[in-house]
Amino acid sequence: MELSESTKKALKAIPLMRTKAGPRDGDSWVQRLKEEYEALIAFINNNKAADLDWFRLESNSDGTRWFGKCWHYHNMLRYEFDVEFDIPVTYPTTAPEIALPELDGKTAKMYRGGRICLSDHFKPLWARNVPKFGIAQAFSLGLGPWLAVEVPDLVDRGMIQPKTA
């Protein structure tokens, strides 16, 4: 996966994780979650400062289930989707599988349940950066580019409609 200079710059502005811990790792997981939230807050603030705000995310109390909204603008129209994912027990070795359930079956670049396909480009990059990458990097390098490619195609094929006020 070759990254553009603007992508590299945006990625460098997201804090990296220091703790290699998953949901079964007790206090280490609590520390990892703190790092995840700090990175997400920095990523969202950077996006807002650049007028590139495109998602909201929250988790359950133990940080194992995440949900929210993401959106993409195409031809001056906003397309908004529910986004969700679970943290795998093997996290951070295994990247989360981000899902947009309402798009299930509408594109070939998706698995059952609306999980977006990231295997060819993103997963090797994730594997090389364990444990430094986290949720913010998964959104920056996974979901964001996926939306940029798939939303225009889905619109052109008449598969999705813009969000109405």
UniProtKB/Swiss-Prot annotation:
This chain's function reads: E2-like enzyme which forms an intermediate with UFM1 via a thioester linkage.
**Active site: which residues?**
117
Protein family membership: Belongs to the ubiquitin-conjugating enzyme family. UFC1 subfamily.
Is this entry keyworded Nucleotide-binding? no
**A cellular component term, taken from the record's GO annotations:** cytoplasm
Q: Which SUPFAM superfamilies match?
A: UBC-like
Q: Which UniProt keywords apply?
A: Ubl conjugation pathway
Which CDD domains does this one have? UBCc_UFC1 (cd11686)
Q: What is this protein called?
A: Ubiquitin-fold modifier-conjugating enzyme 1
The answer to whether the entry has keyword DNA repair is: no
Give the GO molecular function terms: ubiquitin conjugating enzyme binding; UFM1 conjugating enzyme activity
Source domain of life is Eukaryota
